[in-house]
C-alpha cells in the first residue's frame, strides 16, 4: 500500500518569558514560536485491522509510551474509527533539545491520520486533542508562527523575520520538569501589553537555570555568541543564532565544528508540514 510521508519540523522559541505559576503547577508563559525547515520525517500506511504499529524504536522509550503512538490512539479513540496505521519514523531532531521533536511528531501524526482515515476534523479539534498530549502540540497542528500565552496553547499568528539560523546541539538532554521546578527560575516576568510583540529586549527565562545546571549549554552559548546574539530555545538544550544568509550561517557552523555539533536551517512562518499538506490537497483536487 502507498505510504503517506510527511515532515515533522523543528521549532524555535525566539524568546520565552514565564509570567506566573498556576495552582495546578503549570507555568504561565509568553513566547514566540517559529518553525525551521529541518526536522524528522514520518511515513504512514493504512491498516484495516485497527492496529497502531510504530516500526521505529527509540532508545529508552517504550512503544506504547511514544507520543506518536499515543497521538494515533487518542485520535482513533475520539473519532471512533476502526482503521489503524503502520508508522515509520526517521528521527533527526534530538530529544530534550527544546526544538519540539516529540510534539512535532505527535502533530504530524494527528494531521496525517486525519487525512489517511478521511476524518472530518478541523484544525481546532485536532489542536484541542493535541493539547492533551503536550502544550507545544497545538502550534505544530496549526502550522503558523505564533505568539503564545497560557501554557503555550493560546496562539496568535505572527510573522517575524525569517533568517537563516545556526542551531547548536549540546550533547545533553535537558529535563523540562527539572528546569520548571528549579528554585531560582524566574517566574514573575511582566506580561507584555504591546502589540505587535516586540522582538527586542527579550530573553529566555529558563536559560540561566539551564546554564547553571548544564555547562555544555553555557559553552554553546559562549561559542555562538562570538558571532551573533545566541539564545537557548525552550528549556534547552539547543542554542540558536540568526544570520542574514545561508552562506554566513554555514561559515559560522564550520568555524565551530571542532567543538560544537549543530545544523543550519531556514526560519519559516509557515511550517514545512503545512506546505506539504497544502500541495497534497491541491494535487488530490486537481
Swiss-Prot record:
EC number of this enzyme: 2.7.1.148
Entry keywords, A to Z: ATP-binding, Isoprene biosynthesis, Kinase, Nucleotide-binding, Transferase
InterPro entries per the UniProt record, alphabetical: GHMP_kinase_C_dom, GHMP_kinase_C_sf, GHMP_kinase_N_dom, IspE, Ribosomal_Su5_D2-typ_SF, Ribsml_uS5_D2-typ_fold_subgr
Annotated catalysed reactions: 4-CDP-2-C-methyl-D-erythritol + ATP = 4-CDP-2-C-methyl-D-erythritol 2-phosphate + ADP + H(+)
Primary enzyme class: transferase
Tree of life domain: Bacteria
One Gene Ontology term from the biological process aspect of the record: terpenoid biosynthetic process
Protein's pathway: Isoprenoid biosynthesis; isopentenyl diphosphate biosynthesis via DXP pathway; isopentenyl diphosphate from 1-deoxy-D-xylulose 5-phosphate: step 3/6
Function: Catalyzes the phosphorylation of the position 2 hydroxy group of 4-diphosphocytidyl-2C-methyl-D-erythritol.
Family: Belongs to the GHMP kinase family. IspE subfamily.
Name of the molecule in the record: 4-diphosphocytidyl-2-C-methyl-D-erythritol kinase
